Amino acid sequence: MAESPAFLSAKDEGSFAYLTIKDRTPQILTKVIDTLHRHKSEFFEKHGEEGIEAEKKAISLLSKLRNELQTDKPITPLVDKCVDTHIWNQYLEYQRSLLNEGDGEPRWFFSPWLFVECYMYRRIHEAIMQSPPIHDFDVFKESKEENFFESQGSIDALCSHLLQLKPVKGLREEQIQDEFFKLLQISLWGNKCDLSLSGGESSSQKANIINCLQDLKPFILINDTESLWALLSKLKKTVETPVVRVDIVLDNSGFELITDLVLADFLFSSELATEIHFHGKSIPWFVSDVTEHDFNWIVEHMKSSNLESMSTCGACWEAYARMGRWAYHDHAFWTLPHPYCVMPQVAPDLYAELQKAHLILFKGDLNYRKLMGDRKWKFTFPFHQALSGFHPAPLCSIRTLKCELQVGLQPGQAEQLTASDPHWLTTGRYGILQFDGPL
């Protein structure tokens, strides 16, 4: 097997990784500090003087973190007592072991980008955890909820579209296929709403995405939806398969999560799947990633919406969860810095859970980076090989491109894109639905 290429890293000056560590991450830390400042009176009302002291302590820890990052200090071990602390510190040791004699310690602008960026979010969590009684405060909650409220028009249009299709069982097979393709594309473009890319600024969806699909089609660089349809429609017709399980590894809350829930509802209603398992994060992560609280909050707010299409969908989704047809899982592995190819060793229980799926949909850029090991693969390198042996079940990456990493393109395709749009890899303007089928 050929040697794997180098990791993406901020040591490549001018690269997207470099600009993220230099500009976007300090901006996110500043926003987190501002959020804590703004909630000072709320902390006082809830916890008295203790709340004020906790806010000061958290801000002090976060300011120290920002300074370490901006001055390229060595990465230090975590000191909290969480379930994953020892795994993080072991991984830091592993990063240290990869360095050559003159390299010094793992540092922000030198070590793999995936490691240091994940580490920053884990340190934010540590700062809050070390500041009781505000230790369960989600510093990103506000911006996630804002994204949902600002996207109401698009959410209403999408829910109305879904309800018009019901009962889905009454549709002809070609109609089901057509809608399946449509809702996969909506889930793809919903991935544009990423608050970590915008430094935590508003990134809501205000246009009716259904009307834009035709115009957006040329921006899908790899479209394996036919293969997904072939897999699920075949399973549906296989009498020996009474259970068809689809897992969705979630990315962003807000509008993107709604697009995932609408897709899941359609899969269930059309009997392309009999159960859906959602996987989210166990701690606040990368600004807008879904936690269990976000998942339940969205379903609850959909259900209590004064817009009929939204409340109908919300009630429906709550019923699916109550019946056990939909299940939400989280696992500490999703917020570790490890590439997914080591999941069987690091989190064998999670890998075994994913092996129960007939199809896994991995949403978003961070999942793609972890699937690919965040390495500088050639653009034409095969997707299956870049997965480095990770294959719990047939899987598909659904992401808009927000980092300098993409495999499986046709020869000449990347060069053509670079000539017409030099920033095609990082703006979220282009997307992929990239499938790795049954072995």
UniProtKB/Swiss-Prot annotation:
Q: Where does S-adenosyl-L-methionine bind?
A: E256, D289
Q: In chain numbering, where does the motif Subfamily III RTxK motif fall?
A: 399-402
Q: Which residues form the signal peptide?
A: none
- One annotated GO biological process: DNA damage response
Residue positions where N-acetylalanine is found in the record: A2
Which Pfam families does this chain map to?
ARMT1-like_dom
Q: Which residues carry this modification: Phosphoserine?
A: S4
Residues that hold substrate according to the record: D251, N252, D365, L366, N367, Y368, R369, K402
Which coenzymes or cofactors are required? Mn(2+); Ni(2+)
Instruction: Recall the GO molecular function terms of this protein's record.
Output: enzyme binding; fructose 6-phosphate aldolase activity; fructose-1-phosphatase activity; metal ion binding; protein carboxyl O-methyltransferase activity; protein-glutamate O-methyltransferase activity; S-adenosylmethionine-dependent methyltransferase activity
Q: Where does Mn(2+) bind?
A: D251, N252, D289
Sorted keywords for this record are: Acetylation, DNA damage, Hydrolase, Manganese, Metal-binding, Methyltransferase, Nickel, Phosphoprotein, S-adenosyl-L-methionine, Transferase
Q: Which reaction does it catalyse?
A: beta-D-fructose 1-phosphate + H2O = D-fructose + phosphate; beta-D-fructose 6-phosphate = dihydroxyacetone + D-glyceraldehyde 3-phosphate; L-glutamyl-[protein] + S-adenosyl-L-methionine = [protein]-L-glutamate 5-O-methyl ester + S-adenosyl-L-homocysteine
User: InterPro entries per the record?
Assistant: ARMT-1-like_metal-bd_sf, ARMT1, ARMT1-like_metal-bd
Give its E.C. classification number: 3.1.3.-, 2.1.1.-
* Residues recorded with modification N6-acetyllysine: K40
Its biological function? Answer: Metal-dependent phosphatase that shows phosphatase activity against several substrates, including fructose-1-phosphate and fructose-6-phosphate. Its preference for fructose-1-phosphate, a strong glycating agent that causes DNA damage rather than a canonical yeast metabolite, suggests a damage-control function in hexose phosphate metabolism. Has also been shown to have O-methyltransferase activity that methylates glutamate residues of target proteins to form gamma-glutamyl methyl ester residues. Possibly methylates PCNA, suggesting it is involved in the DNA damage response.
Family to which the UniProt record says this protein belongs: Belongs to the damage-control phosphatase family. Sugar phosphate phosphatase III subfamily.
The domain-related comment in the record is: Subfamily III proteins have a conserved RTxK motif about 40-50 residues from the C-terminus; the threonine may be replaced by serine or cysteine.
Q: What is this protein called?
A: Damage-control phosphatase ARMT1
